[in-house]
Amino acid sequence: MAEKKPIKITETVLRDAHQSLIATRMTTDQMLPIIDKMDQVGYHSVECWGGATFDAALRFLKEDPWIRLRKLREGFKKTKLQMLFRGQNILGYKPYADDVVEYFVQKSIANGIDIIRIFDCFNDLRNLETAVRASKKEKGHAQIALSYTLGDAYTLDYWVDIAKKIQDMGADSICIKDMAGLLVPYAASDLVKALKEAVDLPIQLHTHYTSGCASMSYLKAVEAGVDVIDCAMSPFALGTSQPATEVMVETFKGTPYDSGYNQKLLAEISDYFRPLRDEALASGLLNPKNLGVNIKTLLYQVPGGMLSNLTSQLDKLGAADKFYEVLEEVPKVRKDLGEPPLVTPSSQIVGTQAVMNVISGERYKMVPQETKDVLSGKYGVTVKPFNKEVQKKCIGDAEVITYRPADDIEPQLPIL
């Protein structure tokens, strides 16, 4: 019999699952009644903070996100709590000064976070250095994420090279962050095997069901040796969210990868979340379109959240009929901007520029400041060079920086 290697699971229902399906609108009061049972499961961790939860709590729910974190920490006695952190962008959409990054990391860990998953939208590791260093200083677990995407520059050698650098940075683990559901099953197997051979760190896999491949990709990744997978309780699984926790637990039952999780307990947790899902469906907060398979994410390499944002932008402009034109424009803009992964904030920047290019009838006639900042190097270095003609049209002869963008930012704590 094969050697036992129980698969570990990070539960996303309190963060990415509801962020992906109901625009991050789950309230603290909706979370608290079930966390005692969730604490009994034996999860590797529960992702419950960071990402869009901070913004959404303040902007839409009128909640204090710090109070949410403290209440969750109080309720989870045994389970590690995890957050998503946008590197130098913290939980925002632009780079902040080092002192702000350090302070935010310190406060996150002090208020209850154990594991910080840190990523950069360009995979520019310089934008992660401060957050990783701060996490280590506070005795937190620093997990660095590879923002996974497709393109001829993104070879296995590319990912292996970055993974080795991440290990050298002092990270505690690596996450393959497949925010668009682009990682198909056999590619998942190849990538996990390559990373496991190249580095000694635990490897975690995060994906979305958007393209319909996620569960199959998890199966192949687990067989290839991945250590942890991200899953969501079934009422908030599938579609633009993650594979269902209960399904993955059952899949590996009786195999060397058996998690040992109690399905009866998981069913009780699922029963709690089901009425919340039904309520979201009835109110329109949960759009049924977000629950199906969207093959366009593979064709256009656009994450599910970005698809819904594009639809919303075009509806507000009275230009819903331009949707497919914009979808076709997205890969072109992405190529012009150095072919970055499409994840916050690069997904918003590329998407908005694509909309403007189509609506204005002329490419780069209207250029937001964020696009200019990308082309000026103020978000970091991309895997490929910028389109020189586009760069000239957008920023003229303005200086293009090649050093770490945050080196230009004066300390901000005194003015915040």
Residue ranges and their predicted role:
Residues 1-22, 72-74:
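N-terminal amphipathic alpha-helix/helix-capping segment at the start of soluble metabolic enzymes
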Residues 9, 17, 38, 118, ...:
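Conserved, mostly hydrophobic/aromatic
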Residues 37-57, 287-297, 301-416:
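Terminal or standalone catalytic/regulatory effector modules within metabolic enzymes
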Residues 4-7, 42-44, 77-81, 112-115, ...:
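Short, well-ordered coil/turn segments that N-cap beta-strands
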Residues 237-259:
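C-terminal helical cap(s) of enzyme catalytic domains, especially alpha/beta-barrels
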Residues 118-121, 178, 224-241:
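Glycine-rich phosphate-binding active-site loops on the catalytic face of alpha/beta enzymes
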Residues 50-167, 174, 181-185:
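Active-site beta->alpha loop and helix N-cap motifs at the rims of alpha/beta catalytic domains
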Residues 154-166, 211-227:
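Catalytic cores of alpha/beta
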